[in-house]
Structures are given as structure tokens and as C-alpha cells.
Curated annotation (Swiss-Prot):
The modification Phosphohistidine is found at residue 242. This is Nicotinate phosphoribosyltransferase. Belongs to the NAPRTase family. The keyword Phosphoprotein applies. NCBIfam families: NAPRTase, PRK05321.1.
Length: 424
């Protein structure tokens, strides 16, 4: 891979538009895995995805120029999958499986186009929605987040001169390498890049991936970013996300179907995937509710991704459940991916080492940690908690409860209904 002087590139903004998203493959791998299932099983479902800034103190509409945002969104609308990209998806091996993407799905992808967006402003925030068929609207999630995140980074650095930018990136690289030095001390650790959605920039994510590849070698198992996986000959990694049970639950017409919704998703998933792709995401409506109602066959799956409980607490609860089901945790896999920093990774690794197989999906703290790197304090280089989630399905409100109340999504009445329902 060619090395880019990131500071020079940031400073030399002499072009009309510097596209943030240059390929539809610049997304998380699980979006494509989910898309194949959505396209195959739920072609008639219409959804809305919405941008949600959890940190209301950060006024995105004041930080980011609306014209620049529209220009980036419009450019992304123009993107199509290239012939090279389709051939790579068809011919590559993912998770040890050949032809994981079926020919009819890839043929459909050849003409794929993102639906239009709806953008307005209110109280210093952008109101950004994507309406349409689930199989189309879903693919806006990652580009929307990367565009907002990188535009905010660019705005924060706009007034830095070339020397200040050199200092910023030199310090950020040194900071990143110090993390790698700590990770190298953990035998058999498995680290993956899960940092696409809230990255500082595409070029910075690429540098971080190169650094991990160089620094920890075989302990770096791959990246969730499909474009980077293709360009760097890394494994593309990812399983499934909360949007699946959120939509399926929203479509239900009775209590029995609502209770079964999280497991219906798993049954749908197993029609398409196997092996290490059989990873359970249990926390959409609370992990306790999921485990309490889970059919016996769920324990046969390869592993779990505890995504919103504290890692040690969440992992221990799943290990306890496996033991209750007569399974050996040492043969199972836990994927930790929520708000990881090196301290958390070290503590979690030492706690579970030898008890269970582990992979760490390292996200925002990998690809957007610029705290104290600038020559002067720049508040807008701090990361904001930004998500783009499904908010309705066929006109019905979608809900996510999570194990962390701060991550709850949905209108208050539906949230309360789900809380009451899944609490017993």
C-alpha cells in the first residue's frame, strides 16, 4: 500500500471536493452480510434510518458547514459498485467460505444505488433521515457516520498551519504505537479493526490498520472495513447488528411474535451463514431477557458479542449461561467491541484468558483518538457519540433497549412498552 503524508494531504485542500466516501465498499462487512439476508427475505419492508447525536452539547450544525455536508452526501449518492469490487466479492474467501455472496445477490448489487436523503437543521443539530426499502436504506448507515465524523475533524483542523498538522499527526502516531507496544505483551491476543464509523478520516484509519499489521502481526486478525480489506489483503470481519431484531420486532403483530423476534433473526441468519459467522448479539432488548427466553439451540452457536454491558460483567454472564446449558466456555467465542481502549482490553484479556476464546473489535479509540495531540487545545477533535439507527419499519417505531440505558433508542411510549414486555 502506498504511504500518504496525511498532514500534507489535510493541509493541501485545493480541490473543489475531497470525497470522504470513495467506494460503496467503504463500509462495515456486516452491512453486506446483513444486506444479502435483507434482500433475500425482506424485500418489501420499508424503513427509516436516522442520525442520532447522543451528545446534545455538541452542536453538529454549528461545527459542520451544511453546503459541505450536502456535497459529500450527494457524491456518495453517485457511487456504484465497480466491476472490480463485484469480482472481488464473488471470488474472495470470507470466514473460510467460498461464494458467501450468491450470484443473484451480486447481480443485484451491480445496479445498487443509495436512496436520497432528507436533511434539515434544528437547535444546532442536523436532522438527517434516509427513507426507503430496507435493502437500500440500510447501506446509508456507515457512509453517513463517516461523513459527519470526518467533516467535523476537517473543521477542527481548518485553521492549523502545516507545522501544527505535522505535530498533531506525529503525536497521534506515537500515541497509537505506544498502544501497540502494550498489546504486543499479551500472548495470543486477537485484535480486529472495528473503527470505521466514527473514524478521524479514511486515511487515518488506513494508517492505523497498517500500524496494527506491522506491529502485532498475526494477532491482528483483520478489519471490518471492506475496502481496506480488499486493498490490504486482510480478512474482512463482522457478523450482524441490532437493526435486524429492531426491524423484525417492529413488524410483529402480537406478544408471542415479539418475544420470538430476536430468535427469528438468528434462524434467518443461519439460512445464509455458518461457522464463525454464527455469533449472537444478545442485547437489543436486554441480555437478561434474551438469555431467559433463548431456545436451547442458541447455545450451539459459535459465540456471543456482548455489546453494551461492561466487558467483564457481560462476558461472565454469558459464560454462566453457557455452563447452565451444559456447554464448555473454553470452546466458545466472545467478541468484545464496546468502547474499548487499551486499558479495557488488557483487563478483559487477563480476566478471561484461558477461560474462553476472545476477539477484541477495537473501534473509535483505535481510529479517532487525538486527545492532547494538537499543539493547542481543540475541543472539536474530541469524539462525539454519534449513531445512525433504524427508527421505523413499515411505519411502525423501532426500539433498541440495550444493556446501557444511555444507548436506548426509540420514542418514549414504545421504549416503555418494550421495557415492560421484556422485563418478565
Amino acid at each position: 500500500m502506498n504511504h500518504t503524508d496525511i498532514a500534507k494531504r489535510v493541509y493541501n485542500h485545493t480541490w473543489k471536493l475531497d470525497p470522504i466516501v470513495r467506494s460503496l465498499l467503504d463500509t462495515d462487512f456486516y452491512k453486506l452480510l446483513m444486506l444479502q439476508m435483507i434482500w433475500g427475505l425482506y424485500p418489501d419492508v420499508h424503513v427509516t434510518f436516522s442520525l442520532i447525536n447522543r451528545n446534545k452539547a455538541i452542536h453538529l450544525a454549528d461545527d459542520i458547514d451544511e453546503g459541505e455536508l450536502r456535497a459529500q452526501l450527494d457524491h456518495t449518492l453517485s457511487l456504484r459498485f465497480t466491476k472490480k469490487e463485484i469480482i472481488w466479492l464473488a471470488g474472495n474467501t470470507f470466514y473460510g467460505q467460498k461464494q458467501i455472496f450468491k450470484p443473484d445477490f451480486l447481480h443485484w448489487l451491480e445496479n445498487f444505488q443509495l436512496p436520497d436523503y432528507e436533511l434539515s437543521r434544528k437547535d444546532g443539530q442536523y436532522i438527517l433521515h434516509f427513507h426507503g426499502s430496507w435493502a437500500y436504506s440500510s447501506m446509508w448507515e456507515i457512509p453517513a457516520l463517516t461523513i459527519i465524523s470526518e467533516l467535523r475533524s476537517r473543521a477542527a483542523m481548518k485553521n492549523l498551519d502545516r507545522f501544527a498538522l505535522d505535530v498533531l499527526y506525529a503525536r497521534a502516531k506515537a500515541k497509537m504505537w505506544s498502544k501497540i507496544e502494550r498489546l504486543k505483551k499479551l500472548p495470543d491476543i486477537k485484535i480486529s479493526d472495528f473503527g470505521t464509523r466514527r473514524r478521524h478520516s479514511f486515511l487515518w484509519q488506513r494508517w492505523c490498520v497498517e500500524a496494527l499489521k506491522e506491529g502485532i502481526g498475526a494477532s491482528f486478525t483483520g478489519t471490518s472495513n471492506v475496502l481496506l480489506a480488499m486493498d490490504t489483503d486482510l480478512e474482512a470481519l463482522g457478523t450482524n447488528a441490532h437493526e435486524l431484531p429492531m426491524v423484525i420486532a417492529a413488524l410483529t403483530n402480537n406478544d408471542d411474535d415479539l418475544r420470538k423476534a430476536p430468535y427469528q433473526v438468528l434462524q434467518d441468519w443461519k439460512r445464509y451463514y455458518e461457522g464463525n459467522l454464527l455469533i449472537v448479539l444478545p442485547d437489543t432488548f436486554g441480555t437478561e431477557a434474551f438469555l431467559r427466553n433463548a431456545p436451547k439451540w442458541v447455545a450451539d452457536w459459535t459465540g456471543f458479542r456482548p455489546d453494551s454491558a461492561p466487558p467483564i460483567e457481560g462476558g461472565e454472564r454469558i459464560i454462566q449461561w453457557w455452563q447452565e446449558q451444559g456447554k464448555k466456555p473454553q470452546e466458545k467465542l466472545l467478541i468484545f467491541s464496546d468502547a474499548l481502549d487499551v486499558d479495557t482490553i488488557e483487563k478483559t484479556y487477563h480476566h478471561f484468558h484461558g477461560k474462553v476464546r476472545m476477539i477484541f473489535g477495537w473501534g473509535t479509540n483505535l481510529t479517532n483518538d487525538f486527545a492532547n495531540c494538537a499543539p493547542q487545545e481543540i475541543a472539536d477533535l474530541d469524539v462525539t457519540s454519534l449513531v445512525c439507527k433504524v427508527t421505523s419499519a413499515n411505519g411502525r417505531p423501532a426500539v433498541k433497549l440495550s444493556d446501557n440505558p444511555e444507548k436506548t433508542i426509540g420514542n418514549p411510549q414504545e421504549i416503555q412498552r418494550y421495557l415492560n414486555f421484556f422485563s418478565h
